[in-house]
């Protein structure tokens, strides 16, 4: 049982969908210790609890570049088939334990070639771990669906190659494409040819935008990359002007980009704790109650809630939802809405979506 409840219901027992969850940000500290020992990696702590605390402390910098440096350690232990397989398997098992029924694992294969793996071998190792975990969950009477989001690093020059990699594995685990890494100064349009290739192949893309940069980056992701979802997307709130606010109501004016994102129901992959750690919401404040996620949700944007990097943020999807219940007095209806939003944004077939949506509705109804 978790410590997070909504309307008397343990949030961990609710069916959940996780769209923005990085493989190299979801390792168990004990696994890092063991895999690190195998390769002689020097670590900042020698026990799991202390190592987990170190990651959390390092991640509370308020700077996205500093936050990203913690991945030097996690990716170091994910350079072999064995390491990738184990991390992927445990990643899925941890999602299932948290009540996730559909999850997408995003990761950048080009970051995992230091010990001789090929791009294809890396993707295959992750898929093998995913499938083993799905089988283990099923053997215990559970069910979880998982897809890979194959990411390219936006500041490097392998996006065309990674796009082709994603297409090669589209029927073997890969469900979408993403670009990650430092956002400011590296717009999606820099990788235009990769997105053109994907669009011509009818392969969906989500793009990190509205995290480390503002609305220009979001616009570029939508128009140049044809993004169906925005990784974070939080800073779309920069295009919303609050004209009047009382205890009973709030009057706002949406800019053209915000209107487009709302009217087209572009999925926002909001990650509350991560946004605090990286300074994404600094212009609005430094507390979770300052986060524009509630405003976006109340205005009818397609908000989803995600953990981003469970290790760095010391979090789970249950915790992220629970924090919003505490900060904004969200109820079961709010949690069901953002969960259904996530199901609608999932990179799965329409038939799979309908099944997923029914499972979510039934799961919430059973707990009311």
Predicted features along the sequence, with ranges:
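Metal-cofactor-binding active-site regions of metalloenzymes
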Residues: 1-203, 211-229, 235-368
